[in-house]
């Protein structure tokens, strides 16, 4: 409980920094889970650079982009009524999610040194499956998030749920 209160104080004092660091930490955790539980690499075969890349993506891309998106979305559709939460979820999942995945997957490819041609082929292969999988998880999560969670906690709530999603994304992005 003391850790949660410390997090709340830090979030109140430095919302943007804390949100970005939270996203980075949980993206890194998602990659660790992917490598250890999904891919079963073991500690000897764990790719630390990959984990650091995913954590960096969380801090440098996911945190700022998703955190910024939530602010824009709250400006476009203010309030937390059921109807507004539904509108936010539809805009998020119909507009933002497809664009986000379309940027995230190739960004991982670039950071992994893939050629433009290989990256494009991988995006064409993996994007439809990633987007469909997105729709199994995120509409319900986002509906609850937009209805029940204050704006400054949304990124943290999503990133906690996203530990599972990040594990999937890391696995999907690193499949050859």
Swiss-Prot record:
GO terms for cellular component? cytoplasm; mitochondrial inner membrane; mitochondrion; peroxisome
- Offer an example of a GO molecular function term for this protein: channel activity
Give any Pfam family that matches. Answer: Mpv17_PMP22
Primary location class: mitochondrion
Alphabetical list of InterPro entries matching this protein: Mpv17_PMP22
Coiled coil residues, start to end? none
- Annotated site residue numbers, Determines ion selectivity: 92
Q: Which example biological process does GO assign this protein? A: cellular response to reactive oxygen species
How does this protein lie in the membrane? Multi-pass membrane protein
> What does the protein in this record do?
Non-selective channel that modulates the membrane potential under normal conditions and oxidative stress, and is involved in mitochondrial homeostasis. Involved in mitochondrial deoxynucleoside triphosphates (dNTP) pool homeostasis and mitochondrial DNA (mtDNA) maintenance. May be involved in the regulation of reactive oxygen species metabolism and the control of oxidative phosphorylation.
Protein name per the record: Mitochondrial inner membrane protein Mpv17
Q: Which organism is it from?
A: Rattus norvegicus
